[in-house]
From Swiss-Prot:
The keyword Repeat does not apply. Its main location: cytoplasm. The lineage of its organism: Bacteria, Pseudomonadati, Pseudomonadota, Betaproteobacteria, Burkholderiales. Zn(2+) binds at residues 564, 568, 665, 669. NCBIfam families: alaS. It is found in: Cytoplasm. This is Alanine--tRNA ligase. The gene is alaS. Catalyzes the attachment of alanine to tRNA(Ala) in a two-step reaction: alanine is first activated by ATP to form Ala-AMP and then transferred to the acceptor end of tRNA(Ala). Also edits incorrectly charged Ser-tRNA(Ala) and Gly-tRNA(Ala) via its editing domain. Its cofactor is Zn(2+). It comes from Burkholderia ambifaria (strain ATCC BAA-244 / DSM 16087 / CCUG 44356 / LMG 19182 / AMMD) (Burkholderia cepacia (strain AMMD)). Pfam families: DHHA1 (PF02272), tRNA-synt_2c (PF01411), tRNA_SAD (PF07973). Belongs to the class-II aminoacyl-tRNA synthetase family.
Amino acid sequence: MKAAEIREKFLKFFESKGHTIVRSSSLVPGNDPTLMFTNSGMVQFKDVFLGTDPRPYSRATTAQRSVRAGGKHNDLENVGYTARHHTFFEMLGNFSFGDYFKHDAIRFAWELLTTVYQLPKEKLWVTVYQEDDEAYDIWAKEVGVPTERIIRIGDNKGARYASDNFWTMGDTGPCGPCTEIFYDHGPDVWGGPPGSPEEDGDRYIEIWNLVFMQFNRDAQGNMTRLPKQSVDTGMGLERLAAVLQHVHSNYEIDLFQNLIKAAARVTEISDLTNNSLKVIADHIRACSFLIVDGVIPGNEGRGYVLRRIVRRAIRHGYKLGRKGSFFHKLVADLVAEMGAAYPELKEAEQRVTDVLRQEEERFFETIEHGMSILEAALADVEAKGGKVLDGELAFKLHDTYGFPLDLTADVCRERGMTVDEPAFDDAMARQREQARAAGKFKATQGLEYSGAKTTFHGYEEIAFDDAKVVALYVDGSAVNEVKAGQDAVVVLDHTPFYAESGGQVGDQGVLANAATRFAVADTLKVQADVVGHHGTLEQGTLKIGDVLRAEIDAHRRARTQRNHSATHLMHKALREVLGAHVQQKGSLVDAEKTRFDFAHNAPMTDDEIRRVEQIVNNEILANAPGIVRVMPYDEAVKGGAMALFGEKYGDEVRVLDLGFSRELCGGTHVHRTGDIGFFKIVVEGGVAAGIRRVEAITGDNAVRYVQELDARVNEAAAALKAQPSELTQRIAQVQDQVKSLEKELGALKSKLASSQGDELAQQATEIGGVYVLAATLDGADAKTLRETVDKLKDKLKSAAIVLAAVEGGKVSLIAGVTPDASKKVKAGELVNFVAQQVGGKGGGRPDMAQAGGTEPANLPGALAGVKGWVEERL
């Protein structure tokens, strides 16, 4: 039975039992920003189990795409060395949300395994939690499993309920016993039943885990029965397929065998048992589906985990002798295997291929040099009888050549060595500390404050009349007063000033009373809810307890708000035009522009930029109101609000509905989309691998930009004696004229070179049967120099020639040597001899080479030395 059929039978079986088939959720969890990847079937139902996400069904079944690489759950280092470890796997599961419980869960599992999949009953063993008499009795008395094949597992982790057969969601919350089903491969395979000293062998393999959410545990560890008891089960498709296909390794099942054959094809390897092929076959699944779900290779978070997996696969291809890109070619094979079950993979096939190809090409630029350094270092360690690679070297490979630590550790493991990871960590920590020290030091950084939080009025007001000074800082230290001319940070009890956060810059403005004026240049957070006003006291003396009028620069705030609101609309438009994989990676919103970094693997086309602009400007014309609501985080996310991974959100969040956009945002915004006025993208480019940057302007800035652009178009049209509407056609005509003139000029230069060649030939000096010539050809370009050298070689028959030209303070050099003389006089060495004297370098073939220089004053002397240099070699 093939893997695809096993998956289909599982889902159809539970559908026949009243379960709703629910599509696999994304590998990027949408309901838990703390979780790196979806690693089990229950992740998408977490809030359902907690009772905060009502669904129209009480029974569900899924085939969930899952990844275990990076973070707490990390199988990466074992992939390729064991029979059952994977970075990507499919978890088959059935779930009951307060519906059926132990009896039906156990009965369904037994029926599916023994009737649908027709596994021999005598091959199945089960475990239960030691205190779960109910589950034990169901297995023994209702299902009829012999008691000698039912094993009670007690508390084996040092505390009550700390057992392999007792599941918990966390330190508190839903928990309960579980029962696991094992398959016995028979006495020919070493290993003992679960709970025995030999349980780590391969004879008894766990295939299904049934979790019974029976209790709620409070902070004191007390257990109370849940009013609605639930079921969460998980069975790895790959493990089940291995059992049903009568093989002992997951890599021997049909799905993996097809991918392994494909990996062998693209790496040109015939030995299908090579472990590196297993690694590549496993990794193409994880990498492809992560990219499908919007993850892009990068240097942090999920992006870095993806990069590590890609580069590990590339390294194994390199180990097989593959020196060029190959990994991306497997995407089509993966689509053939899994595209029917997961149509999102087929839809994203080209994008996945492009992302992987770009990442491969980038790593192949450094892998060869890095591997040679690593191999030399390992050979040195072996020669000295050592077993540990220096962590500093591992860090150099990471920092300079892009080798993730686990890739280096992988190579060491193959040699029976390890990496000094503490030394690696120390080197990494030093680099981070240096980066922090070199970074911008904010005026509020490190300020000690223990007072009350600042009340923010800036959403509604641009000024606050009775703001009291509660803290003052000069040069990072708390003071009681500030004198005129001093730079300081002022903390108020109330303020309309927005502190820099979420990409939006802090407000500027004035704090003043009758005797005092403090100019605020920037507003920053001292603590999460404490606002620091950084600036200069222009007049008077400022003391703690003084009462001031705090007033922001309203014009600057309005322009900043327009840009911030436009950013929300642009983010949504980018996802509509480019795809749902677009995720914000950084932003800067100020009064002049909005700068937005996002995950995307290719430059935007002109048409895509125009479409984004059109969508945003249509939303502006619609003049929709901005609606702000404060609500629980979970409710906001369930309502479709976009949350950014890595951002820290409290229990209560601020949700902004603006036109067709809905995001979590604490920034300041326009009241209606029409207030933005006009939106224009002015810059699009790349800032890192897989990260694009767009800069856009709004309102009067955008109008001014278009007016200036229009003026330049009119100037260009006037210069070309054309109407603006005819500009493209007129430019094409001028380009044709330029090409024609360049062609004529080239012909004239060639003719000149021919005539000069005849004259130069007469200047050649014969040395040992070889004519030597070193001369300057005024006005010649590189092409003319080459043609002249070729003609001189034909004319002189046996020659060593150097010709030079000077233009704009730069020297161009061409050297040519006829075949009979090139064994003793190499053109590359000859041109380098001259180039080094004129401040340059160069090289090429033995018969023809070129170079450049920046010191034309030295050229006459350099050319004069050619004759002697050649004579020494003949």
